[in-house]
């Protein structure tokens, strides 16, 4: 994450230059979403569930800094609303859900050993789970993509 933040900080310099050149806020947001944010979101599905909160906050702090450059003297929540940008955490969750659903629904993917099996109860439950979450012996496997995604989908149903 430190290397990602370092790469992004180099690109933030260009945002400062665009702001000094009086480029419109919409164009700066467009530059941020096309050139800077993809660096922070690259392969985020792999590390999202294993990412400690302090590293997640470090990534979010970078986005907060960019938005404070574009919209000075404005609260972060207001900047997000003004620019139409979601928090990085929300985008990572959406990306993980999208990838998991793509893997589940694509029949050509041969990952039957890794994908948690679906749960079909014989009776109605108030909080039915969609997938059987595998038992894990280590935290590393517990926080990996498939068990965490299955747990996340079960919690949100």
Located regions from the model:
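Hydrophobic/basic alpha-helical segments
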Residues: 1-157
């Amino acid at each position: 994450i430190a290397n990602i933040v370092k790469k992004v900080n180099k690109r933030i310099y260009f945002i400062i230059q665009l702001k000094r050149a009086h480029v419109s806020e919409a164009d700066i947001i467009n530059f941020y979403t096309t050139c800077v944010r993809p660096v922070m979101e690259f392969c985020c599905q792999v590390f999202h569930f294993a990412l400690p909160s302090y590293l997640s906050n470090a990534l979010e702090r970078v986005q907060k800094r960019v938005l404070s450059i574009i919209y000075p003297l404005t609260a972060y929540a207001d900047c997000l609303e003004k620019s139409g940008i979601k928090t990085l955490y929300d985008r990572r969750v959406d990306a993980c859900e999208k990838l998991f659903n793509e893997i589940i629904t694509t029949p050509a993917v041969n990952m039957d050993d890794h994908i948690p099996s679906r749960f079909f109860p014989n009776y109605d439950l108030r909080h039915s789970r969609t997938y059987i979450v595998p038992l894990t012996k280590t935290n590393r496997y517990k926080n990996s993509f498939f068990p965490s995604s299955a747990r996340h989908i079960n919690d949100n149903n």
